Regions:
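PLP-dependent amino-acid enzyme catalytic core
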Residues: 1-322
Length: 322
């Protein structure tokens, strides 16, 4: 992984991905005790940053392999990103999704033209299912985070943050990233290392699923023992990736951990003050900025809202939580 791959991904994505801005609200600033800058990837195509990695991975593939079709496993956002990217490249797509994924994510993935295969998150391995179907059908597997071209695509978020930070005069700030397996976090970290080295990347995770935060403290990969138990489904993973982990270990600061209650409150704040729809996992970084303010340094903080694919009932719960 290197910055040249991320710059190449930016060229492929140009004209296809939404170039999201940095947004600010004085109301959020008051809660956080500093200026809060929000990178709203909930406004990205398919409702999350995952479109970037999916499209870049398909664009970079060998044309013959791409024509044979692709397969991915995902709780929903990578699923939708790959499904739309496959449709845009006129190829077939199979998505392996947990049966407890939000209904909206499952229905949207099907609407993009993908074949959806459901599995039991608590008792089955999506990796094993994906590898088996890939071999049986001759499909190319696009992993959700531990895939170089996927990381490169996600890293384009970091290039844009660096550009906008310069415009706004932000030279010293924590950049808090919603973190599951680390594809977005490591991609942003690589981009900022090259283009804005004074900005510090910090992962945000739900409590009891903070494998990256624990890994950073321990200096080695730590695993989560549970596979379910948080509303932040989009960022629940077993452990950091083999590719993403060494990047995060080298470039990331101390991890931040938030509760489900804080995630819902952040969803409500994003809607009230920025008119943004965030899903629970996508609001984790904002929750850390607002409710873990004593763990953050500097007069500015930049956060990703990484996704907005939330079921209406969950969103209503969030709005009622304040």
């Amino acid at each position: 992984m290197n910055i040249d791959m991320i710059r190449a991904a930016a060229a492929r994505l140009n004209g296809h991905a939404v170039r999201t801005p940095l947004l600010n609200s004085s109301f959020l600033d008051q809660i956080a005790g500093r200026r809060v800058w929000v990178k709203p990837e909930c406004l990205q195509r398919t409702g999350s940053f995952k479109f970037r990695g999916g499209f870049n991975a398909l664009s970079a593939m060998d044309p013959v392999a791409r024509a044979n079709g692709v397969i991915a496993f995902s709780s929903g956002n990578h699923a939708q990103g790959v499904a739309l990217a496959a449709r845009m490249h006129d190829t077939s797509c199979v998505i392996v999704m947990p049966s407890d994924a939000p209904a909206l994510k499952i229905s949207n993935t099907k609407a993009y033209g993908a074949e959806v295969v459901l599995y039991d998150r608590a008792g089955e391995s999506r990796d094993e299912i994906g590898v088996r179907l890939s071999a049986q059908r001759g499909l190319t597997l696009i992993k959700p985070f531990d895939e170089p071209e996927v990381i490169a695509g996600q890293g384009t978020v970091g290039l844009e943050i660096a550009q906008d930070a310069q415009v706004h005069g932000i030279t010293d700030a924590d950049v808090i990233v919603c973190c599951g397996g680390g594809g977005l976090t490591s991609g942003i970290a690589l981009a900022l290392e090259a283009d804005a080295p004074t900005l510090r990347v910090r992962p945000a995770e739900p409590e009891n699923f903070e494998d990256v935060a624990r890994s950073l403290r321990a200096g080695r990969i730590e695993k989560n023992t549970a596979a379910t138990g948080s509303i932040c489904d989009a960022i629940i993973t077993t452990q950091p990736g083999d590719i993403t982990w060494p990047i995060m270990q080298r470039l990331c600061g101390v991890g931040l951990v938030i509760s489900d209650t804080e995630a819902m409150a952040a969803m409500a704040q994003a809607f009230l003050h920025l008119k943004l729809v965030a899903e629970p996992g996508g609001a984790a970084a904002l929750a850390a900025a607002l409710y873990r303010r004593d763990e953050i340094e500097g007069s500015d903080v930049i956060v990703t809202i990484s996704g907005g694919n939330v079921d209406p009932a969950m969103f209503a719960r969030a709005l009622d939580s304040l």
